[in-house]
Amino acid sequence: MSRKVTKYSAVLAVSLFAAALAGCGSENKEGTVGTGPGGVATVGDSACVQCHSAVTEALTGESLIAQYQKSSPHNTAGLGCESCHGGGAQHNGVGPIPFAQPDASRCADCHDGTTAVATNSDTAFAESRHNIQTIRSGATCRRCHTHEGAVLSNIAGYTGDLATLEDTVNQNKVPLVSSYSQISCATCHEHGGGLRTIKATNGAAGPVVNWDPNNNRTVDQFDLCTSCHNMYSYNGSTLLTNGVPVNGVATGTVGHHETTWYRIIATTHFDNYSTGPQAGAGASGTNAKVEGYVLRRTGANPCFDCHGHEAKTNTRPGRDATIHTDWAKSAHAGGLLTAKYNAVGALTGAAAVNAAMNAYVDDTTAIAWTHYNWDASSRGSCQRCHTATGAANFMSNPAGYDPTGAGNSFSHLQGWSAANGSKQNELLYCWGCHTNAGTGELRNPGAITENYAGVNSTSTGTTGTAVTISYPDIAGSNVCMTCHLGREAGENIKAITDADGILGFVNSHYLAAGGQLFGKTGYEYATRSYAKPTFFAHDKIGTAAAPGTGTNGPCAGCHMTTPNSHSFLPVTKDGTGAVTAITSTACATCHAGAYALTPEALTAEEEEYVASLEALKAALAGKGILFFNAHPYFYRDTNANGIGDPGELVSSNAFTNWAGVYGLALWKDVMGAAFNANLLIHDPGGYAHNRFYVKRLIWDSIDFIYDGVLNNDVTAAIDAQVTATRLDSATATAAKAYLGTTRP
């Protein structure tokens, strides 16, 4: 039996994706003569069916032709049997055929990302948990830990929650076989690559029903994967965990491993609607909770949105890191997996499951994803970077993307409407940046030309024109540039017309690292040069101009050439923030010999960068402009003590009189100094991205705001802040060491 299973497993691995493009294989599935794969003429499906209609799958007894005609994407796409097996003109039932038993590598011949959608099945499955797991043939375990048990259970209806699987009547519905084998391609795929249909039992010893946990009346990927990796009951009505209610949400019990939190999909893939942001237009939802990822359950690839055939996530504590766990602990996921680990700690069993289900991230670590009701139309302009949906839609079609977010649909979020949004929020999921998580294929927005909207306000009589800045094409790093260019640039201030210089602060927004890297987003003072030195090379990393640093541009070249690529961190740090290791391989390519970087040197550089920004903040405070890290960022120092007192740090006390410092003619330069401070405070890696550009911005901002003149008296300006007790001497010394005694 096992030999037959092995034989048909190979045959059934024709395709692992439901999409294939015309042009693969024969010209016509019904036999217009042409040359098929393997260089042999084709004869059409009718000839195949004549002889092979009686051939059955050894394990199930089902007709292979019936399976193919029922579910194969190659049949419905009009490709035909010969698109996988090769031309049949020499076959005639006994002669050769090019690919009698096509395997996963045969699939890859067409599924290369060009002819048809790419698949990582030919390489990834071999090392997957599905392929290397221990065969378990016990009454319950064989349902998901053997090929035969899974396939026969699909037919018998032995699928469902714990009560269903532990019921002996249900167990006895599944025929026994003489031996059991590993999960294979054929466990999930019928002949021709279609997904197997799954039956379930409604409760213990209940009637057999269709397994349809996303309740869309279609056999799809979510049904297949969650038949073992349970998340919902057969009709989607009940969340399956360990049976303990979660913040008022009733749950059932998963089919097995109900006391092992990292085996329960819902501990990481369920975001509790009841704890989400306030619904409604304009709702802020500040400090909403996100407990898990929200799956696009009825989409084409709800599981393959983030997984491929590698089937190895390694969520279990202590396991080797994977791309999935790196991402889940990263800022793009708000550190959600870290929150789960911290909540579980040393707990075990049901207590661990409860802790994991209730663990969440909020504004503390995930402010980019939790602070507002991002999917409501009132936040439409934010959706490009604060939702995976907006990011994916922009990168798929930058020219056609509506910056108001009007084209974004979040129908996979519970209760969503465009006006009110949903009480669930997205993180930056894998599919935000990738078109294919299994192969790693990135979205391709091309070189980013950013349109920084004009600054306009009817209340202050302010008008401004839009500013357009073109950035170079940096391959895969274009994906990063999509959201790391800020919302406003220094040029926006220069493009403003305002009669009295009294207006709200122009906010650069956060983490605009790409703009600093290419020296384009700061407020640049007239008569000063900001051209990069000829030897500056950080903007060339990941290009042909910097051999040995990769091919995906500077963002990926620095942040993703580490053992933990999807942590997006080029260094590791200890609890104090000190750099403990430089893990990016790009650094050592150039910084070698006398220019070699050390963790200690990089820590010192960062500390001096921060000190120079403290000096700039102090100089601004000396003019009555107080910085506080909350919108609108700059406030009036009403008692002139140089300190942001609680009563001063409120939005009604926002600093707006920029002309009041040095007169109407210079108001833009005053705001420019504040703009540069805000821009760089919110780019903590600015010292590494482009140290020449950021030093010049800080130098010129301190130089100007101190006395309204660009006269290079920066050292005196910093010393004056110490004298006025707005800056301590140690910080002043570090700031002067960073900036030097002459303009960088």
Curated annotation (Swiss-Prot):
One GO MF term attached to the UniProt entry: oxidoreductase activity
Lipid-substituted positions (N-palmitoyl cysteine): 24
Residues the record lists as binding heme c 6: 225, 228-229
Species in which this protein is naturally found: Geobacter sulfurreducens (strain ATCC 51573 / DSM 12127 / PCA)
Binding site for heme c 11: 555, 558-559
Annotated protein name in UniProt: C-type polyheme cytochrome OmcB
Lipid attachment, kind S-diacylglycerol cysteine: 24
Subcellular location: Cell outer membrane
Entry keyword set: Cell outer membrane, Electron transport, Heme, Iron, Lipoprotein, Membrane, Metal-binding, Palmitate, Signal, Transport
Transport keyword on record: yes
GO cellular component: cell outer membrane
